[in-house]
Amino acid sequence: MKKRIFAALLALCLTALTGCDWSTADPEDIFGTLTDYYNVEQKKQDVKLTSFALPYLKGETADPITCSDGAMQTLGALVYEGLFALDGQFEAQPALAESYTYDAARYTYTITLRSGVTFSDGSAVTAQDVVNSLRRAQSSARYSGRLAEVSDIRASGGAVRITLTGDNRSFVSRLDIPIVKSGTESSTFPTGTGPYAYSGEGGAHLAQNASWWQGKSLPLERIELTACKDTDSVSYAFYAREVQLLFCDLTGADDSSVYGSGDYTDAATTIMQYLCLNTRRAPFDDPAVRRAVTLGVDRASCVSAYLLGHGLAAQFPVSPASGLYPKDLETAYSQDGYASALEAAGLNTGKTRSLTLLVNQESSFRVSTAQTIAAGLSRYDLQVTVRSLPYDEYVQALEQGDFDLCLCQVKLTADWDLRCLLYTSDAADDK
């Protein structure tokens, strides 16, 4: 049975660092990063680069549906494309899709494929290629969540029909899922349609895809690939200047890859840190108290101190990078404003209310953030202490409602569907 939780969306909408997962960014972002490295007249560099190399995990698949996060997914952004691509404001722009229609009565999208598009081997992209990739994505760890409401995917001539279980007018924002050529899925580098293609001739590298349908000028003709055995060796290769681009996740449990000197490029993501309030316990069963707490977190300071500025403070569950973000409705943080709200909620009686803020101890970033939030909220009657637990115990406490406040993380879909936060039978944390 589903249980209702109240998520006070004291949000920190995160960016990823490319250059020191930009899983929601389009290839233009990484092209810009590559170009910057070669623009030595405008940037000071200790060493002028004569080649550019990216890491890959030896023995692991580059299949964009099943590959691991990080290095392999970064390569995939250069080799594969989806039906749509998200721009910098998270708006879906046609890529392999030329156009689409939506039948609201039948909850069905009909997507017409762009004509003349071929894979890097010269073979035509077909509707069945798209269907096969999307069906595989339905059962994958990375994409199954965003396709959970899909009831049917089928080819119809040169089009793809996707039927949903309910109405969703923004579903195409979820369809930046990479498409690979059917029958090549088991290859280490399946065949794609992107600007580059894998080649083993003369050493592992990415070569320009001569048949790329977009035909844009690319910053590099060849990108060398450096084999690494694991993420630690990827970090070492970056610091040794064997590779020139490193994916960094400042919020991960393992933050050993961060962060020395280098040039940083941010790409907005849909990852959101938020504070969950247990409305089944006092004092958060009182709407006035919940409103007060939303004013008591200095989001900007958390981003500055613990994300090194690589994030966006948000008061609503939408990235501020999105055109949908209601910036005009924001309330500026102030200690006086928080104090006034506590007084209005009757929490200035002198009687201490001890509360616990639950957090996953495996992320040092979240523990530090939780401690700062707890200190900021501890005013007048409220005294908030942090309870950090190993992940499994953290999830158990969250599912059992054994908390007053909880610092959580979620990766939203680009259509900003909040149902996973408002009604869920699982812990709202992705570790």
Stretch-by-stretch model annotation:
Residues 53-104:
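N-terminal lobe/hinge region of extracytoplasmic solute-binding protein
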Residues 114, 207-212, 267-292, 296, ...:
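A bilobed periplasmic-binding-protein/Venus flytrap-type ligand-binding module shared by bacterial periplasmic
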Residues 163-164, 168-222, 232:
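Gly/Pro-rich hinge or "lid" segments in bacterial periplasmic/extracellular proteins
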Residues 211-255:
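Ligand-site clamp/hinge motif
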Residues 285-375:
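Append "and occasionally in soluble cytosolic enzymes with long acidic Gly/Pro-rich linkers
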Residues 345-412:
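Ligand/substrate-recognition segments at binding pockets and active sites
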